[in-house]
Amino acid sequence: MTASLLLHSRWIDPVMFLYDNGLDDMSKNMEGFVGGNFAANQCRNLIAHPSTLAPSTTYTSSEVPVSGMGEPVKQCSPCSAVQNTPSASLPYGYFGGSYYPCRMPKSCTQPTTYGEKYMDTSVSGEEFPSRAKEFAFYQGYSSGPYQPVPSYLDVPVVPALSAPSEPRHESLLPVETYQPWAITNGWSSPVYCPKDQTQSSTLWKSSIQDTVSGTDGASVRRGRKKRVPYTKVQLKELEREYATNKFITKDKRRRISAHTNLTERQVTIWFQNRRVKEKKVVNKYKGIS
């Protein structure tokens, strides 16, 4: 004997049905039980719910396919056999083999634990929208040969959103621009922030200018070279060429570099500084006069 909960696609009331293998034997004994005026196949709107059903046999809302929640509920006429014999009280377990989608009067049913809670037949048709919210029935797939599928509210939308990701063990660079942020989504990788580039670039340059031991064991700074003043011979040669022409050419720069033991870059920079110095002196005398 198996029992399950079905909900017809046109009505919202949950209806219990009982499938019994011994239906033919019960149908034969039905006429004698009610006095000969009642047939087992005349009342298809009765609910069959055995009292021996285990209380643990419950069904959640996700196992019940529901469709057409907003359609009106159709009232079925009471059983003709019950109208003829109002004093006959029919126990549960004698009607089965199908489910009954109609609402049934109290004279045809004797609701027990599950029926008393959900099969209140005195409720009017206007209260069914609120009853749908109470039962927590949501629109799912319609009933058919397939297994009932839970509705969209019974399944988490994005299960991986709140789940923390696997931490990744990465070695962080000892640079101030890389700072591990506390991300709520579970990230553990360092995030680079380019806004603080102006402040941290100075720290980066200062870290480069560390002292490293040379071949002779003396400490040499990798940063800016120490300023070396030019000799008198070098300055004399540079001043002589500057008096001839304030702007130096490529050939002239190579010749001066060869005579003074200076690089071409040093010669070019000296000529630039010399022009700036002369311009400052000229502007100073113009301001005084």
From Swiss-Prot:
The keyword Nucleus applies. InterPro entries: AP_axis_regulatory_Homeobox, HD, Homeobox_CS, Homeodomain-like_sf, HoxA13_N. One of its GO terms (cellular component) is nucleus. Keywords: Developmental protein, DNA-binding, Homeobox, Nucleus, Transcription, Transcription regulation. Coiled coil: none annotated. It comes from the Eukaryota. Pfam families: Homeodomain (PF00046), HoxA13_N (PF12284). It is found in: Nucleus. Its main location: nucleus. Residues 223-282 bind DNA. GO terms for biological process: fin development; negative regulation of transcription by RNA polymerase II; regulation of transcription by RNA polymerase II. GO terms for molecular function: DNA-binding transcription factor activity, RNA polymerase II-specific; RNA polymerase II cis-regulatory region sequence-specific DNA binding. Sequence-specific transcription factor which is part of a developmental regulatory system that provides cells with specific positional identities on the anterior-posterior axis. Belongs to the Abd-B homeobox family. This is Homeobox protein Hox-A13b. It comes from Danio rerio (Zebrafish). The gene is hoxa13b.
